Amino acid sequence: ELLTDNMARPYSSLDYTAVWNRETNFFTPTTGGLYTDFYYAIYRANVVVESFDLVEGLDDATRLRLEAESRFVRAVCHWYLVKMWAYPYGYTADNSHLGVPLRTDAVAPPSPRATVAEVYAQILEDLEFAKANLPNENGPYASSMAASGFLAHIHFLRQDWSASRAEAERVINSGLFQLDDDLDRYEAGSDSVLAGDLINPETVFGITGGHQTPIRVFDPDKIVVVADHTVPAPS
């Protein structure tokens, strides 16, 4: 996301400048903590899935929705991990090349890296579960449409064109989203575009909140900020 147009402006951080310029290294904080942060999120998702019996008065519908939301998070995190720390899908004919460790239990002994085929199989299983058991609209939380959006992208990378098209058309034909009227998301002459401005009618699933203030990322022509790490400045 740091290298795409999902950004706003401005303020300062050499950390994000390094990402924008593709000059990251082991000591770049933003990338250095990603591996651990994704597994923290996966761990918490697994804890939720394994802890329902500890909650009194939890009805079946709520339990199913929470499990689906948790498995959505687990799938998305595993997907970003395998994209960043493994050769891409299709690098070997059967995708037997090493991916990343799979974590589907809250407490598990250290395990070797699963193959890319195994990681993608788990991702698809979790997203299909989320798609089947989440509502099409779910407020700020994961939804069935969000699961279809990720499935469309993942099937595209797998070169399963028909499956990718089916998931994309499901989202498009839902009537819940529409293309943004203005492709210029950065107001000319504006000093700041807040993260909230980047959630628009075409957003299927987005995260804009965070504890950080807006951060500058430089290119030769403009100053921008990553939306996922911006919060409105105090008045």
Question: Whereabouts are the PLM-identified features?
Answer:
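Conserved, well-structured interaction surfaces
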Residues: 11-84, 114, 132-135
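Short coil/turn linking the two alpha-helices of tandem helical-hairpin repeats
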Residues: 82-89, 138, 157-160
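Hydrophobic-face positions in mid-chain alpha helices that act as interaction patches
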Residues: 165-235
